[in-house]
Amino acid sequence: MISIQSVNPNEDSFDLHSKEGVSYQISVYVPDTAPPQQGFPVLYVLDGNAFFRTFRDAVRLQARRSSKTNVLPMIVVGIGDARREDFVSERRCYDFTPPSSSLKLPKKPNGEPWSETGGADTFLAFLEETLNPQILEHYPIDTENEALFGHSLGGLFALYSLYTKPSLFSAYIASSPSLWWNERAILAKEEEFRKNLHNETLHKKLFVSIGSEEKGHMVTDAQDLAKRFSAINSSSFSFSFVEAKGENHMSVVLAVLSQSLRFISLRT
């Protein structure tokens, strides 16, 4: 049983606990228009304490005239740490990083040791088995039109989700993905996904962005990924890549936000 608090007529908030006892703050925006027969598309936003309000307002303002903006009315679900901080480093470091039998990481800029890593499968299970059923029970969602947004390590997680459990979402927004993590171990999962893409029966969409002013390896890693996915010719896969000129690791989210919303709003 969850206790849903109404923040305003179109927005709810509640705390949700994982099976492991981790508490998350869940924020939900619902358009003030009547839902279509199949329900609203839904966008799940990682680092919700930092990004939920930004995505909420972008959807709210643009979906008022979808015929002009090409942004559909959609439910926005923010997933944040229950401590209400924008970013909780140790939580992100665990939830968003893939498990690995061997871990090779650079030193952190502040010289502190890395906190526990490798919880991506556990977090995926929380999304699928705990959060998604609650959203489905309480809100009119289109179960065939669910998207996931993640930035930085969250972008890495979005890609990991696509590569390892593509049935969970139909569209993915990977903003400045941390492909460097653990000496680019994610590339093995990517290769396996690309090889098996012809077996995918449901259409998948992937939007990747990077700021041109980010660290060199971030930019080249994203560019290389874009080359690989742009070469795919498949009726079951759509891909878009944006390198935002003059944008840095944080500003890129705002710079390409509307483009990413238009992309996931495209009907396939």
PLM segments and residue spans:
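Non-catalytic cap/lid and distal C-terminal segments of serine-dependent acyl enzymes
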Residues: 1-268
